């Protein structure tokens, strides 16, 4: 009986330590998220996508997909072309055929 009780107590202590470590990790990740300047509030998607799509001849589709990507990824790369490494989600979101989803 004592071994069952000690196993239960040990399991609870280990679970508590794991939860504490996980919460500490989440707090650190959230602190890093707040310091990134590439993440715009949702209201900034329009102007940032306007800048991103300013040099294309296909403005409507560019703005549509840029806003869609911005709303999902909360990030728009700077400039009118390239720089996608700044926003990994924006860069890694692909179409069914494997092409880039975001302009």
UniProtKB/Swiss-Prot annotation:
The encoding gene: GASA13
Organism taxonomic ancestry: Eukaryota, Viridiplantae, Streptophyta, Embryophyta, Tracheophyta
GO biological process, one term: gibberellic acid mediated signaling pathway
Top-level taxon of origin: Eukaryota
Keywords: Disulfide bond, Gibberellin signaling pathway, Secreted, Signal
Primary site of residence: secreted
Function comment: Gibberellin-regulated protein that may function in hormonal controlled steps of development such as seed germination, flowering and seed maturation.
Post-translational note: Six disulfide bonds may be present.
Protein name: Gibberellin-regulated protein 13
Family: Belongs to the GASA family.
Subcellular location: Secreted
Segment forming the signal sequence: 1-20
Any Gene Ontology CC annotation: extracellular region
InterPro entries: GASA
UniProt cross-references to Pfam families, sorted A to Z: GASA (PF02704)
């Amino acid at each position: 009986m004592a071994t069952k009780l000690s196993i239960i107590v040990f399991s609870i202590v280990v679970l508590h330590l794991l939860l504490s470590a996980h919460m500490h990790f989440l707090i650190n990740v959230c602190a890093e998220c707040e310091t990134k300047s590439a993440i715009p509030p949702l209201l900034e998607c329009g102007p940032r996508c306007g800048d991103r799509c300013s040099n294309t001849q296909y403005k409507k589709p560019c703005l549509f997909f840029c806003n869609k990507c911005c709303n999902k990824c909360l990030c728009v790369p700077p400039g009118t072309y390239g720089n996608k490494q700044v926003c990994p989600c924006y860069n890694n979101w692909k179409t069914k055929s494997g092409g880039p989803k975001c302009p």
